[in-house]
Amino acid sequence: MFKSLYKETEGFRLVSILTPLCMIGEVVMEMIIPKLMSSIIDDGVTAGNLSHIYRIGGWMIVAAAFGLLFGVLGGVFGARASTGYARNLRRSMYRNIQTFSFANIDKYSTAGLVTRMTTDVTNIQNAYQMILRMAIRAPSSMVIAMIMAFTINARLASIYLVAVIILGGCLVLIMSRASNYFSAAFKKYDDLNESVQENVSAIRVVKAYVREDYESEKFKKASGNVQDLLLRAEKVLSFNSPLMMATVYTCILLISWLGARMIVLSGATSFTTGELMSMLTYCTNILTSLMMLSMVFIMISMSAASAKRVAEVLEEESTLSNGENPVMEVKNGAVRFDHVCFRYKADGRDVLSDINLNIRSGETIGIIGGTGSAKTSLVQLLPRLYDTTAGHVYIGGVDVRDYDLKILRNSVAMVLQKNELFSGTIAENLRWGNKDATDAEIEEACKQACADEFIERFPDKYNTHIDQGGTNVSGGQKQRLCIARALLKEPRILILDDSTSAVDTGTDAKIRKSFAEKIPGTTVFIIAQRISSVENADHVIVLDNGRISGYGTPAEMLATNPIYQEVYNSQTKGSGDFDEKGGDNNG
């Protein structure tokens, strides 16, 4: 963990070193001042020596000025180091997340990753700045003040030593207890963020079903869990300040009483008034340093859980990787599944079992099955969004695990069930498929996807701005734009995962006809609930609970497969889309 976190200090190590050095310089200047003050009182005021007062007073001003300079520089360097460190952490986390497979994403959840990149990194940033400044300043101040106090009077200085040992032990107990609560609280932050994210992204559904009160209670519960744990931590930490103040005042009283007795009994020969003033100042410095150190421990205990969570993301390796000599070209779209089994979790059940398929390049394959029959799981194995649990998937005669991952995914285009558009113009969204696509190529792809029909009606046409998530276009328009974006990749394999469900049957037919005419060499997989979407496919795969129930032409399936027959009959009689009884939502 420490190695991965230390690596992110690169570029800011010099200021990270200069910050504590400046803090030490500030402490040295502060520790000189009480000694000079003692000299002014004993050798200047008591002796009536004005020249000594002016001379030592001048040195005090110089020491104070240098202390101020070191303090300001330490603050500037510390801020630069901590903000730069946080920037490096977020950048490296984001870069590593981009390499994650779907399995890695499933492990952390989107809300969890957001929390780690925001709240957790901010905690680490604050702790890093405090460590660079206070974690060096406080011990340095305490040690130097202790040494100076012992040079004045070892008997009185021993009071400080006892107080430091007692307080140190109490701090360890307080911090260890509070750290456990903070660790649990940050885990609950994931649930809180997930609740917010889910509610905001589905706000239309929430309002449509009048579920505002339910969602408010759900958020209240998640927020209450975080509050409860943080409150417990704060209750433990609340002992810190009273304990510190009680110790400070006790030490001041003891030193004042014992010091006054020594001055009176010795006649100010073995112990002077100036030395007593210095001892009281050093007492305050020592115990204030200990208080600052306790604040550092509090911040460390808060950030320790965050540091662990951030390090997990930094050290996480994608479950997918290239081989030693990856294949750099996908020759064609021929697909073969060889005894493929797949499960999402190592200890879970198989969602795909013993899948065997042999599909020629350029064929159009329809996939039919009820919810939970693993239709989506099947096609996600083609671009290696997941790896098989057992068996092999071949594209162009080569195992998908032998391809360079980027080359493979550039050869497979997917239009997912949940279509995503990004804020920007229509043209900018479409160029996700091919960043170098010309205007003519964009227009041609839109014609194939029947998207040109509505784009031409917009005043700004292809420069029309799309809101985040595509909220200013309809579901059918969004689907057609996503299909056009996929076509711009000129893929060997095109996967349409229920991607025409929001368009009318006439437009659906036009899109399929365009595929047959414009991209005859591309292997097309069409996952659909509507029989009309797959009736012209070369072959149809019928899935039932992760197993192939039937495979053949649409006519053969209609004649021999009960599931296909039920879908066909339910729709031709006007019953709407068929949804076979299923289990988990893997379809």
Residue map of PLM features:
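Juxtamembrane helix-loop junctions of ABC transporter transmembrane domains
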Residues: L21-C22, M29-D42, A63-T110, V114, ...
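A short amphipathic helical element positioned immediately N-terminal to and/or at the very start
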Residues: M1-G11, L113
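Transmembrane helix-loop-helix hairpins at lipid-water interfaces of multipass membrane proteins
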Residues: E10, S16-L73, F77, F150-R155, ...
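ABC-type nucleotide-binding domain
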Residues: M328-G587
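An intracellular "coupling" helix at the cytosolic face of ABC transporter transmembrane type-1 domains
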Residues: G11-R13, T99-A103, T119-L132, I136, ...
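Helix-loop-helix
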Residues: N49-I53, I144, M148-V162, G169, ...
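Short intracellular "coupling" helices and adjacent cytoplasmic loop segments at the cytosolic face
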Residues: A47-G48, T83, R91-T115, T119-V121, ...
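Transmembrane helices of ABC transporter permease
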Residues: G11, V15-V28, S39, Q129-A185, ...
